[in-house]
């Protein structure tokens, strides 16, 4: 079966994004739609561990070529950062139970992959051309806090700053977040999202997690004896 893929172009056409609808987190941005598609395809192998952790290795291996099902204009974030920041046509309305549970399983696999990479990469990360960039712990803190203190608000969750940065706090956040995703889909959360939708929230959470996981992999200095 082809991989349903969406192209999202920035309003000023400075950057574009290509992402998979059915595999949350498999998303890449580039200077053009064509390059975004090429980059997305090149990351197929890098997404494979996530599918494996989700128990979907066979399904992912059988996935066919990328098939564009929507070509849309995104938001300013698409131009500025090369990321998708709004839901596609396919990500509207409530999710079916099977669809929701599949997406949640893949999100949990993204978390597990993130945790595994964070545990094995070097504390110091390779710097950029001008010597800038974050170390591993700053990447971890940013990834966790953005999800737990920002994204989770979309489904009615509020936690103290930094509360998810401890092992117990992170485990509790993830458990409560999953409960909240299910509750929102069931209509049990009174305050509804304005511009986001539940499928987009799950996809965006997965993308943000994987984007920084791959960043840590790419900047890992372990092979060079990094501390």
Regions found by a protein language model. Name each.
Residues 2, 45-99:
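Short, charged, surface-exposed hinge/linker loops at domain edges
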Residues 4-33, 37-56, 115, 123-171, ...:
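Short, contiguous alpha-helical
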Residues 7-9, 78, 85-86, 110-112, ...:
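Short, flexible segments with low predicted structural confidence
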Residues 15-16, 82, 86, 93, ...:
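Generic signal for short, ordered secondary-structure residues
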Residues 68-80, 168, 178-182, 192-194:
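A broadly tuned preference for mixed-charge, low-complexity surface segments
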Residues 83-88, 121-122, 148-151, 184:
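Short hydrophobic/aromatic-rich motifs at helix boundaries and adjacent loops
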Residues 89, 93-120, 163-190, 200-210:
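Acidic/histidine-rich alpha-helical segments that form the ligand environment
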